[in-house]
Amino acid sequence: MDTLTHTHWFLLALGALIMGMSKGGIPGAGNLTVAIFALVLEDALGPVGVPMSVGLLLPVLISADVAATGVYRRHADWKYILRLLPCFLLGTVLGWWVFDYFQGGNDRVSQLKTLIGVILLSMTALHFILQARKKKKADELPSAEGSSTQNPPKGSMGLGIVFGSIGGVATMLANAAGPVAQLYLLVMGLPKYVFIGTSAWLFLIVNVCKIPFMIDLGIITWESIVVSGWLFIPAMSGAVLAPMIVKRINQQIFETMIWFFIILAGFRMIF
């Protein structure tokens, strides 16, 4: 990490700030941080910097998660956390094995990320198709209006298994599971603050559980922890400042922004 320049440090701090804002209520923005960290570390360390960026980012994620859970501590819906968590952890173990298998084979890791991006965009398209059909039925049956938002959609348990497993692999390979969990929680129809609080608590637990796996892979070292430690301040600052912006965004704009970043993240995984 001695090869990091002032420009590298500035970009890493900017990425940490953006990640904090993502955790604090500006959904999807953290996907930009994943790209920033990977590009900066690749420039500083060469090809080995790409996998190292995953380990460098994890403590920063956890610091932002801690700040976000403090802000939204009363808004988490543990029913959905407990539904997603087991499969997220199972997917994390699978991702650990895959990461270990593909270390030194970046082309094959890229192919797996492409597959995740295709699945993510496919699920997004499916959601919009279902929403269009639901709206059509609501127009035909006015008395049914509003009923669909009161209870979780049918098959939500099965969706939790699918989304959790995919998310676990994605978070281990690239710290890129945010859109997967956000897609699931959005389909469940959670209100804005419950959405953010549930997501924050879920990823705090999952990210802490990832620590021993990343140490085993050699992508978290004492040197990387020192660098990550300096990035805690911008990350936590972003998480604390984000709610001030969230309060000024209505639910429709909020959800539109989520979908935009989910689609953007899907294309980023593919290309």
Enumerate the predicted regions with their spans.
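Membrane-interface alpha-helices at helix entry/exit sites of multi-pass transporters
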Residues: L45-L57, Y80, G189-W201
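Transmembrane helix boundary and interhelical junction motifs in multipass membrane proteins
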Residues: G25-V34, L173-Q182
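Generic transmembrane alpha-helix signature in multi-pass membrane proteins
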Residues: V34, V66-R73, V180-L185, K210-I220
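Juxtamembrane transmembrane-helix boundary motif
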Residues: M1-M21, A35-V50, V71-G167, T221-F271
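Transmembrane alpha-helices of multi-pass small-molecule transport proteins
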Residues: M52-V71
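Anionic-ligand binding region
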Residues: M157-M172, G178-K192
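Hydrophobic alpha-helical transmembrane segments of multi-pass integral membrane proteins
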Residues: L190, V194-M214, S224-V226
